């Protein structure tokens, strides 16, 4: 039984160069987890597969021109020493932790105990989201005070980027469908919930 899912801070790109449009990323080497490479190949950026702990040295040695990570990485991993720019790309956050509960255990517990567990799990999800959002805001404010440039990728650029990778979510879901997981239905439900909360996706993803 899924109790709750926790979200991370928002992904963005720290760079050694100023940019705020997709063409400016062409040929630039961006350090990232390999699973994120499909997001950058269509814009002709060059993914450099590295763990976050290696991003600083990669940028310091010019192996990479940028780093895909949270804005807090500018402080936590000292990326601000090698990257004077951070772009809020609108990638959103990740679901970094999902809390599960054994169904047999759940069935054995009194209803009032299960209700408390569910309530705390939901409250934890909201609290983690609030903390992550505030951390983003606080770090950005400090970076701006230190002279770091923080750009927000314009909506039309985000829409163009989304168009270039529009088939990625559906194809990924279909791969999981083939393994017996209802991924396409989960993705459709996710989009439905997001729309109900007022979020507008840059396009209608083919599913």
What are these regions (language model features)?
Residues 1-207:
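N-terminal secretory/targeting leader peptides
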């Amino acid at each position: 039984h899924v109790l709750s899912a926790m979200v991370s801070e928002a992904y963005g790109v720290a760079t050694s160069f100023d940019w705020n449009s997709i063409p400016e990323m062409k040929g630039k080497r961006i350090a990232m987890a390999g699973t994120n490479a499909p997001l950058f190949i269509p814009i002709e950026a060059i993914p450099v597969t590295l763990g976050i702990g290696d991003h600083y040295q990669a940028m310091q040695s010019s192996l990479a021109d940028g780093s895909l990570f949270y804005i807090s990485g500018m402080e936590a991993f000292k990326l601000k020493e090698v990257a004077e720019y951070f772009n809020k790309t609108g990638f959103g956050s990740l679901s970094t932790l999902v809390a599960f509960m054994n169904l047999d255990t759940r069935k054995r517990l009194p209803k009032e105990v299960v209700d408390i567990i569910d309530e705390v799990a939901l409250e934890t999800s909201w609290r983690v989201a609030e903390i992550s959002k505030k951390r983003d805001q606080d770090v950005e404010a400090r970076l701006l005070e230190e002279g770091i440039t923080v750009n927000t990728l314009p909506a039309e650029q985000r829409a163009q980027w989304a168009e270039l990778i529009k088939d990625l979510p559906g194809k990924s879901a279909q791969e999981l469908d083939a393994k017996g997981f209802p991924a396409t239905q989960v993705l459709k439900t996710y989009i439905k919930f997001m729309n109900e909360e007022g979020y507008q996706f840059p396009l209608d993803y083919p599913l």
